[in-house]
Amino acid sequence: MKLRLSVALLAILVAGTASAQHSAQKVNIGIKGGLNIYNINNDNNTEYDAKPGFNVGLLGHIHLSRQLALQPELVYSLQGAKYTVSNVDTKINLGYINVPVLVQYMFDNGFRLQAGPQVGFLVNAKSKTGSVSVDIKDDVKPVDFALSAGIGYVHPASGFGIDARYNLGLSDINENASFKSTNRGAQLGVFYLFNHKR
């Protein structure tokens, strides 16, 4: 079900950007990837530490005016956290397909401010202690909502760029627990816009 939904979202992204490109010639499709530093914030006494991960996916950059743009993305993101009990480390690995839709304000020098909502669809969830890995997907809610904000830069002549953002989780990711846990993390990555103009 989640795979079909992800494919449908990808089809909408590609079709929508292609249609807009045909009508306005102000749309770019791109690829992106980068590093995650994520953590889990919770209401109980567990002290989580940030854990590195990665993200990779597609984006569409839609010019609304000279200064404003809309950027929907379809990204696989490895998130989670880690904690230590009695000198034993446990990693929580949460894999999401995230769909942020960002409004961007574009400066003439290539810099961009961006912010917008994000919805994430859980793909996999595992808890790993030493060499033992346990599937915890049933303990994590299938959909996550967040707000994203950050800054980016695209080289006007080439279409290559860098992107930094912070994602603040808004919804409880615990399926069964009596306490609330939310995702939050920072991302740093690179991207490339095909047929980039301005």
For the regions a protein language model found, what residue spans apply to each?
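Bacterial Sec-dependent N-terminal signal peptides
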Residues: 1-27, 32, 190, 194
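Residues that define the transmembrane beta-barrel architecture of outer-membrane proteins
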Residues: 25-27, 48-54, 93-97, 141-147, ...
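Outer-membrane beta-barrel channels and translocator barrels
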Residues: 22-24, 65, 108, 156-158, ...
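Residues on the lipid-exposed face of transmembrane beta-strands in outer-membrane beta-barrel proteins
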Residues: 31-35, 54-64, 74-76, 99-105, ...
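Helix-adjacent hinge/juxtasegments
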Residues: 82-115
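Outer-membrane beta-barrel translocator domains and adjoining extracellular loop/strand segments
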Residues: 41-47, 82-88, 125-133, 174-179
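Predominantly the C-terminal beta-signal and adjacent terminal strand-loop region
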Residues: 71-73, 79-84, 135-198
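Short glycine/proline- and aromatic-enriched beta-strand/turn motifs that initiate or cap beta-hairpins
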Residues: 21-63, 70, 169, 195
